[in-house]
Design a protein with these regions (language model features):
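Alpha-helical transmembrane segments of multi-pass membrane proteins
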Residues: 462-464
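Conserved, well-ordered alpha-helix/loop/beta-strand core segments that scaffold catalytic motifs
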Residues: 4, 26, 85-129
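Beta-lactam-recognizing serine transpeptidase/beta-lactamase-like catalytic domain environment
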Residues: 80-92, 131-176, 181-427, 457, ...
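Structural motif corresponding to the C-terminal cap of alpha-helices
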Residues: 116-124, 149, 190, 368, ...
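Solvent-exposed, polar/charged alpha-helical surfaces in well-ordered, non-transmembrane soluble domains
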Residues: 5, 13, 17, 21, ...
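A short acidic/glycine-rich loop-to-helix N-cap element
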Residues: 428-439
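Flexible helix-coil linker/hinge segments at domain or subdomain boundaries
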Residues: 453-460
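Small/polar-residue-rich segments within soluble enzyme cores
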Residues: 1-98, 425
Length: 476
């Protein structure tokens, strides 16, 4: 037999007050707590939400359910008379094993990121978009936003597609942003040099019966120009100088194929075909960012390697936990041998040598300067390093790449020589223009410029507009 049943939950307080005096004996009201999200849709996909019993259902609420909700607290009581129970004499009053989490998110940066990714998607007449802002040196995630979003307070009014934190759950083919990985791997292996020129085959190159094309036809390009002009043909030629297994090792070292371990819920590892299965077409395509699935956060972590002179910095979202006594904790070891929680920055890992990272960073700076594909990412008074990306979307129904759907992106960091923030902007299926330099770069510019002002990094006199030749000492 059940001694208790709910008749209705979360009723309006005014209605409860009106009914209170009219209810028969045995029927009453119970006050319940519920999670309220004062910023409404801001950070909705990241935070997630709780259900009617305060259980985490999505996002960080789900990821850290056991910490945020705590364990049920038991009380030792004795019965006094027929109904009343009181705690036993001397029963210790212990706080429940419940924690709060201090996130790395800066609410000011989150607000402007939400605003500009929404504007970018609307102006590009696109399906959706994602933007991530990360502290370059520590890996702290300062903002993560996807548009369209949803209000966690009213989650039942939205479809499940709105709940996805596409910064970590959605895979996409990165396109030309991936070329920085290809160039750095080939430079590290000594297979190319800064003073080389590459034959662009007048805009069309055939590999294994597959035609690779450049947007603009070129005869020859220097190594800097390969990235600045974003040549697919030259990137394919450079990538194919690497053996598949060596290339695959570099790709994995940059974090692709494994979860970023940021603390965000539902991280996807992406998808990389094993090197032993690569055809010549696979090898060439991966060299310019097609045929590999990555998450936006994975791509940002890889870009950030060049902001850190060759070191990979693990992203993180939780600065520390706070217990019921107000103590800050960087680690929690639950009893019973369950998985430990560790918060805050982690130790960085060297991926490539500083000389290689510095050289590729100079190439990335040229991308945002006069004649580069991301002139719209440049910010007056700040030097910007970055790379555009425009990739086709594979259509499983057709069994080939779509001719109408694209992903446009731009990822980079600023100030280029002393990076404070690394940012990636991704626009899915833009209809106004399909190029990352046109639709994603301006969103990056606005987010980066305003973030610099928030962080009190003020503009300096403008840098020279272009740099076609770079000399690098072997001893640097």
């Amino acid at each position: 037999k059940r001694s208790f049943v709910w008749l209705k939950r979360r009723i309006d307080p005014e209605l409860a007050k009106a009914l209170e005096k009219q209810l028969p004996k045995g029927i009453g009201f119970v006050d319940e707590f519920r999670r309220y999200y004062p910023q409404r849709s801001e950070g909705g996909q990241m935070l997630g939400f709780t259900g009617i019993d305060s259980q985490g259902l999505e996002g960080l609420e789900y990821q850290y359910e056991s910490l945020l909700k705590g364990k049920p607290q038991g009380y030792i009581v004795e019965k006094e008379g027929t109904y009343r129970t009181v705690p036993l004499k001397g029963y210790p009053e212990r706080p429940p094993e419940q924690f709060s989490l201090q996130l790395t998110i800066d609410s000011r940066i989150q607000h402007l990121t939400e605003k500009h990714i929404a504007q970018g998607v609307i102006e590009a007449q696109a399906d959706r978009g994602t933007a991530i802002v990360m502290d370059s040196s520590s890996g702290a995630i300062l903002a993560v936003a996807s548009y369209p979003g949803f209000d966690p307070n009213r989650y039942r009014q939205f479809s499940r597609a709105h709940f996805l934190n596409r910064a970590v759950t959605s895979g996409y083919e990165p396109g030309s942003t991936f070329k920085i990985i290809t160039l750095s791997a080939a430079l590290s292996e000594g297979l190319i040099s800064v003073d080389q020129n590459f034959d662009c085959e007048n805009g069309e190159y055939k590999v294994g019966g597959h035609r690779i094309r450049d947007v603009k036809k070129h005869q020859q390009l220097s190594l800097l120009q390969v990235l600045k002009k974003s040549s697919n043909i030259c990137a394919a030629k450079i990538g194919m100088r690497l053996s598949p297994h060596v290339f695959q090792d570099y790709i994995k070292n940059f974090g692709f194929g494994s979860r970023p371990d940021s603390g965000l819920a539902a991280e996807a590892p992406g998808k990389l075909l094993p090197a032993k299965k690569w055809t010549a077409v696979d090898h060439a395509s991966i060299s310019f960012g097609q045929g590999i699935l990555v998450s936006p956060l994975q791509m940002l972590v890889a870009i950030n390697v060049f902001a850190n002179r060759g070191k990979l910095v693990t992203p993180f979202t939780v600065q520390h936990a706070i217990d019921a006594s107000g103590n800050s904790l960087n680690q929690i070891d639950p009893p019973g041998g369950s998985e430990s929680y560790r918060f805050g920055p982690k130790e960085s890992k060297r991926i490539i040598e500083p000389q290689v990272a510095d050289l590729v960073r100079e190439f990335m700076i040229s991308v945002t300067q006069e004649g580069g594909t991301a002139r719209r990412a440049s910010i007056e008074g700040y030097q910007v390093a970055g790379k555009t990306g425009t990739s086709q979307v594979y259509d499983p129904k057709l069994g080939r790449y779509s001719k109408t759907q694209y992903v446009a992106s731009f990822g980079g960091f600023t100030p280029a020589k002393d990076p404070r923030v690394s940012i990636l902007v991704l626009i899915r299926n833009p209809r106004k223009s399909l190029y990352g330099g046109v639709v994603a770069a301006p969103v990056f510019r606005e987010i980066a410029r305003k973030t610099m002002l928030i962080q009190k990094v003020f503009p300096e006199p403008s840098q020279p507009n272009d740099q076609e030749s770079i000399r690098v000492s072997r001893n640097d």
